[in-house]
Amino acid sequence: MTLDDSSLQKYGFIKRETLGSINIDPLQTGGLLTEAARQALVEWGDGYSVCDFCGGVLDQIKKPPIHDFVHKALPEFLGCDEARVTNGARESKFAVMHSMGKPGDWIVLDGLAHYSSYVAAERAGLNVKVVPHAGSPEYYLDPEGYGTAIEEVTKESGKPPVLALVTYPDGSYGNIPDAGKIASVCHEYEVPLLLNGAYCVGRMPVSAKEIGADFIVGSGHKSMAASGPVGVLGVSEEYAPIVFRKSVYSKVKEVELLGCTARGATVMTMIASFPEVVKRVRNWDQEVENARWFSARLEDMGFIQRGQKPHSHDLMFFEAPGFYEISQKIKKGRYFLYKELKERNIHGIKSGLTKYFKLSTFGLGKEKLGVVADSFEEILKKYENV
């Protein structure tokens, strides 16, 4: 490629096509920036903007107040002893896995774990034992399955796994497992537990200490109204010296964080949104009520919600026999739903999906959720004689 003026025209400022739509994409609903974060994005957008008064360690910067955010606010918010800001939830998971295990060791994952949990384990050289779920329709995860998995690893390898992980909730069905019971089971075998709260931290109340988790992971760009990539990591006092160990070459830098992590706009948008994020977590009961109301509306139309019932999270998975039947009868039917929703200024269901899809009701409120539900009903009626 020749980098001449003509070829460079496709780059530069690019408008976002979906901006302003009613957004039901589970990846995006919890990451929409607050007004304060949008201002911070411009104010702190330069690469190393937060380093005007840096003494060499990101989380020790006091102006802006990154130190207080990381060492005072985040531990309280996450319910942990020590916390750090990272470049994302997957980076947080890898930091824990890499510091807790050695190549060839084992880790236990739930059957609904995100792909990045597997990849993080793979990158750390760990073997994976999976706790199976019960399958359709609820995909229930039995806490006792962790005990079985730990015993299997111990029998096969001669020693217990170095870590167990539970996804809370999972990113497919929005199920919230009994993490407290899982923690108890794991601790009976002296196996520490990592709570993957990428869809939890910043949306709903959660405390690592109350659950009994030794580690907690969150995603700023997925659930804390921050500009990504940015995440959080909370660690118990017992394991903090392991995960946050210092480099022998640069004595103030933490090895697993490669010294410093989220700099500039990422950490500052997270900080800017934090007051509102704390407040919205207190409104979680209303979010659950809205999700259940929306699910009931869709099920009245013939949709089938998979996963836990009654549901306790904004992320939901639906089977849509009505939409799928339409897609089989019309030209280019795979894409009809995406086009119909786009015409109604609704974004979030991926192009080509009609039989199964997931969505999120987070932050929309009853009025916008009503618009989405009404739109689904209108689309079904539009094609009922096809």
From Swiss-Prot:
In-chain residues carrying the UniProt-annotated modification N6-(pyridoxal phosphate)lysine: K222
Binding positions (pyridoxal 5'-phosphate): A89, R90, N196, S219, G220, H221
Keywords linked to the UniProt accession: Protein biosynthesis, Pyridoxal phosphate, Transferase
GO molecular function list: Sep-tRNA:Cys-tRNA synthase activity
Gene3D superfamilies: Aspartate Aminotransferase, domain 1, Type I PLP-dependent aspartate aminotransferase-like (Major domain)
Similarity field: Belongs to the SepCysS family.
Subunit and partners: Homodimer. Interacts with SepRS.
Protein's job: Converts O-phospho-L-seryl-tRNA(Cys) (Sep-tRNA(Cys)) to L-cysteinyl-tRNA(Cys) (Cys-tRNA(Cys)).
Listed name of the protein: O-phospho-L-seryl-tRNA:Cys-tRNA synthase
Source taxonomy: Archaea, Methanobacteriati, Methanobacteriota, Stenosarchaea group, Methanomicrobia
